[in-house]
Amino acid sequence: MSGKRAVLNKDLFFQRAERLYEHWEKGADGLDSIKSLAFVYGETDNPYTKTSALFTWLFGHEIADTVLLLLKDHIYILGSNRKVEFFGSVTGDNQSSGKVPTVSTLLRDKTDKDAGNFEKLIDHIKSAGGDVGNFVKEKFSSEFVSSWNKALEEGGVNKNDVTLAFTHLFAVKDDKEMDLIRKSAQATTASWTAARARYVEIIDQEKRVRHSVLSNEFAAFMKDSKVQQALAKYEADTCYDPIVMSGGNYSFKWNHESSESHLHSQFGTIITSFGARLSEYCTNLTRTMLIFPSSELETAYEAILAAELAVIAALKPGAKLSDVYKIGIDTLTEKSPKLAETLNKKELGFATGIEFRESRLAISAKCDEVVKAGMVFIVYIGVDSIPNKNKGEKGKPAAIAISDTILVKEEGDNEILTEKAKSRLKSNVIKFKEEQENREAEKDNDQKKMLGRGQRSVVLTDQTRNKTTNEELRKERQKELGVQLNELAKARLSKQGGGTDEKKSKKSNVSYKTEERFPQDADVQKMLIFVDRKYDSVVVPIFGIPVPFHISMIKNCSQSVEGDFTYLRINFATPGSQVGKDSGQFPHPLAHYMKELTFRASNIKDHHSDSTAPSHNLSTAFRLIKEMQKRFKTEEAEEREKEGAVKQDKLILSQNKLNPKLKDLLIRPNIIQKRITGSLEAHTNGFRYTSLRGDRIDVLYNNIKHAFFQPCDNEMIILLHFHLKNPVLWGKKKYKDVQFYTEVGEITTDLGKYHHMQDRDDMQSEQQEREMRRRLNAAFNSFCEKVSRLTNDQFEFDSPFAGLGFFGVPYRSATTLKPTASCLVNLTEWPTFIVTLSEVELVHFERVSLQLKNFDMVFIFKDYKIKPQMVAQIPMSSIDKIKEWLHTCDIWYSEGIQSLNWAKVMKTITDDLEAFFEEGGWSFLNVESDNEEAMDDSDDSDAYDPEEEDASAGSGSESDEDESEGEETESDDDDEGSLDSDESEGKDWSDLEEEAANADKRREVEEPSRDRDRKRPHSSKSGPSHKRRK
């Protein structure tokens, strides 16, 4: 176990222990004669052992110097004090399944070097009878393990190897394991993306880099947060040291070390192999980059790729691994018999998991094991000694190797977990394009020196013409999503039984439900106005009969004094008098309603013995009605606030002093009245925020829908944000979002203060701020990791991707919106903006036009009762990035020129859902965008051609160039939108570099004449365009 506090996942332990005992009861693979199983793990140089795999599979950790004894009716664990505490949650009667026997722990006794404990365990083994199962071939070097093995020998216990039985047990992965393996594959493919970019940089700039240096760089990618992004919070490492090979020195052994020789980046093939080991689960990837390949080498690559795909397709449940091997050999032989001769025929892959390579489940000619659904295989095909004639002797021999990690599915195609690292030929070919020397007549010797020889630039298929292909693929995928969208929406809404809103039943405001409750006060008997504060009613006399009115029926009342009389006017709520949500509260709107009543009373005493005048009753009634109305409206507002709010479970406090904790945090919104700091601490089932004043706010894990951690990089605050599933009532208000943050740096700056560029105080303060930001990021990140471990990865924090952010106006002010793995958020400004992508039906772009600088984005949710969410004023330059992001999230989008009234649109849809989908559903949004595409296609002939522009500029005199310079610049700016169409016609990076070089040459030619022109006065027309002035 590591130095960090570990927590045993109780449910997962019993789930897997139950699988183990069921496998044991079947008696397969020699387990029928085994009555007990004993395992111990110690120090070893081998990172992959069956014992460590068993401990990781059962407990989630490699637990050294601990004996695990499994009997049919009991489980014993011998370990140190800390390890006994680790198993505390599963000992005694804590088990959740009757199939798993009781777990007991024994505390190590170092006084006799555990001789007494060993004797107890051996007695239990002998009582069980039969042989003890063990991984006989595994050797460990620790003193504790040696003592245990010696005790077994002295006790006469016979060991029996059960490696094959546990190989079959570990081979089929459960849902938790599949999830971790998928994440491991994501880390592997993310590292390959970074490695591929590194290769392009090396080849393009002709750098000399050693194979061993690249191996270390690729290993670092596994832990680089910029490469892994959301996966950086997991414990990830490499399965083995990355292997980088080129220049004819190739080996297909997994323990091959990358050489100290330099990478051959100008010819042949570069083979790269590495894999991620995330949370102890392994995946692997091998790719071959072809550098300026011959046609024979490309054909060989296609044949090897076809053989790999054939092996992947043959790995179906029920198939023998030897038959799968034969299919791979036959496919390669059919494609190219010569390649089959130099194939690495030992095996074409193997099963993987916690152990990188399971040799007993290898795809080889002699392995007759049967494939099962849920198994994970690494398919690896490598061929050596392939001729590469184009590059002479140096390019021979070449080698090609391709490897992927796949998950066997019960039905349908197998899942290629590393599919994002594309293995197709055009994604792994690098070619050079020799740029011809500029042969135009140039008289200036400086220009010739500047031009030099022709340059070489890397041309990747994905960088040039394939952009058009990617755009077409995106459009095809969007069409598929559009069809699926209507089908799924129609099916979903039909199950819901229509989209009609359920009207909330309003509380019946009846004054007195029984006659006994009617007041018998003296004012009622005297036919005066009586205000009953107990039942929120007003009793007024009408034709000599006291009539009660509930306070909710009184719209308002007014009092006036005219001469000797006081008037009280009461206006009642009637149908049609109220407009809004409460307009439909009348049960019988067609009945007769009283609109107003006016009472008059004298201000003069009727008799000198009276203590008050008759008008006193009206004045008192007026005051009490006003007070009652105010109180009733306040209570109604509180009840409305409580609607939808849930009462959280009780927070279970953890007594451990090492609970994850953050101090000096502020809270938003202002649940606590005063702006004071506090601490946030993670407990067993939730968080508790405690202010310095003692205020407490609890947030439970099971009510958190999304948890976000936003670092303080380029931000003024660092924060943790919780978006809740159900609103929670804190105080008298309900909240669905709560945020804990710390301010970083100065929010305001004194502009009147004198600043010097080399002011030591300012430089020191900036350095201190950078250091503080680093410490804060580390502290918050550590808190998130500890919470994740505390909850056994059941609770995770999501972080926004700053690189995918874009500006927009979700409410009233412009903010930066950033995507996360599951949402689009803005957490810095308040109120926060959070859209859950899984709840989004589609996205529509409004006001998309070349004449406009901004557009709007509207989110339509799967629940049509929810009001669509709009983000306005997004810069047009961000639309392609947003489309690509939505495409990767499999969200259908559409665009149009006009802005729609979404309240009316949604009402029309929900009024008649069947008719809406029969008429095409949401496809009506794409009508405008289809028309726009047709108009764009008709304008392709007017696209800007830089080469023609260069020719016309080169043929003119220097003075002509000066005069036309501003016009050319404006033309470049205006025609910027047409560059995409030029690229679709085959323009690559080298062409663009050539145009830039030509522009620089012309600029240098023009510089001397400009210098001369500056010495004499110029007219306004002869100067450069204002767009060129800086």
UniProtKB/Swiss-Prot annotation:
Compartment(s) of residence: Nucleus; Chromosome
Family per similarity comment: Belongs to the peptidase M24 family. SPT16 subfamily.
Biased composition (Basic residues): 1015-1030
Region of interest (Disordered), residue spans: 435-477, 491-514, 927-1030
Consequence of gene disruption: RNAi-mediated knockdown in embryos results in failed hatching in 83% of animals. In addition, these embryos lack the anterior pharynx. RNAi-mediated knockdown at the L4 larval stage results in failed development of the anterior pharynx. RNAi-mediated knockdown at this stage results in defective cell cycle initiation, duration and completion in embryos, and abnormalities in chromosome segregation.
Function: Component of the FACT complex, a general chromatin factor that acts to reorganize nucleosomes. The FACT complex is involved in multiple processes that require DNA as a template such as mRNA elongation, DNA replication and DNA repair. During transcription elongation the FACT complex acts as a histone chaperone that both destabilizes and restores nucleosomal structure.
Keyword Ligase in annotation: no
Pfam families for this protein: FACT-Spt16_Nlob, Peptidase_M24, PH_SPT16, Rttp106-like_middle, SPT16, SPT16_C
GO cellular component: FACT complex; nucleus
Gene designation: spt-16
Top-level taxonomic group: Eukaryota
Tissue: Expressed in the germline and somatic cells.
Name the UniProt record assigns to this protein: FACT complex subunit spt-16
Biased composition (Basic and acidic residues): 435-449, 464-477, 998-1014
